């Protein structure tokens, strides 16, 4: 019996079955490569859903973790710590916003954005009664009650009612539907510039820019959920930049911690985040010194190694190669930077399993899409290696 088998058996025996992972155990990782207990190496083409943009166990980020762990790891927000201010400075410089509110996970940051929008609507905009937040069909903003209440996926909501009120859903990319949904009670529009879980869906050109203009016209907060699409993944620091749009609020997470320690935040101007007062929101671990130190290093790696630019260059190259695969089963190849989806005419799961057997790890999303999102430190030669595996698995002969 292999150690991999034993680990999977133990995990399945005691763990709640809220995930359906590929049958592989990862025990070590470096850069884009991961290793199982038997010593087999695989190329990671998922990056923990874009949390590992800087590559696994990046030495600078790991050193920051070790150095800070020897000093102080947690103070709670009852006291100041000497790392949180550095983190704030890094984020406001990057986003060109005035204030930051730190949390731990992406879903917590989404919850924070919802609370921010509602309180801003009542205290600043002066909305009477129930504030409304507009979201898009196909969205994925996390697994908390607010997030699943925004969702249009029935399975995300099944058995969890009653859902939270105050959310209005419009078709993603339909600017007329968005404009029609705005009322005097609209507080915010929360949108993913590129929808990841929906299958790497890019909205029509001009959609985000016009939505931003409508938000300004109606005094509605434009909130960009860049948890998965941001921090270099799309070939720019933020995917919203593809339409030259500056949102009122950023929601950040995943790669903000470099795949080493969870940290998330919302960033906005003072007029928006000053709606909070002591006691109105918080998190024991949010803004802890260990996460803050790790995040500063993670952002420095993205900057020093030009990873957003690298993502753009290599993503363009990789997509061009993927589009050369001639197979009628491939419905579409789309993406920005190294955030790529191959949409098939049938279930993508068997092909992800076949790619695993060829040493390439990826995961299906939205049933029929193979998501490809490797760490941004991947080389051109490694992308060629990945392409060879993908081409072999998707070749008509292999399928038949």
UniProtKB/Swiss-Prot annotation:
InterPro entries: Aminotrans_3 (IPR005814), Aminotrans_3_PPA_site (IPR049704), Class-III_PLP-dep_AT (IPR050103), Orn_aminotrans (IPR010164), Ornith_aminotrans_bact (IPR034757), PyrdxlP-dep_Trfase (IPR015424), PyrdxlP-dep_Trfase_major (IPR015421), PyrdxlP-dep_Trfase_small (IPR015422)
N6-(pyridoxal phosphate)lysine sites (modified residues): 254
Record PROSITE patterns: AA_TRANSFER_CLASS_3
Swiss-Prot/TrEMBL GO biological process terms: L-proline biosynthetic process
Cofactor(s) essential for the protein: pyridoxal 5'-phosphate
Catalytic EC class: transferase
GO cellular component: cytoplasm
Domain of life: Bacteria
UniProt keyword annotations, A-Z: Amino-acid biosynthesis, Aminotransferase, Cytoplasm, Proline biosynthesis, Pyridoxal phosphate, Transferase
Subcellular location(s) of the protein: Cytoplasm
Pathway: Amino-acid biosynthesis; L-proline biosynthesis; L-glutamate 5-semialdehyde from L-ornithine: step 1/1
Enzyme Commission designation: 2.6.1.13
Listed GO MF terms: identical protein binding; ornithine aminotransferase activity; pyridoxal phosphate binding
Function according to Swiss-Prot or TrEMBL: Catalyzes the interconversion of ornithine to glutamate semialdehyde.
Family: Belongs to the class-III pyridoxal-phosphate-dependent aminotransferase family. OAT subfamily.
UniProt-recorded name of the protein: Ornithine aminotransferase
Lineage, broadest ranks: Bacteria, Bacillati, Bacillota, Bacilli, Bacillales
Gene name tied to this protein: rocD
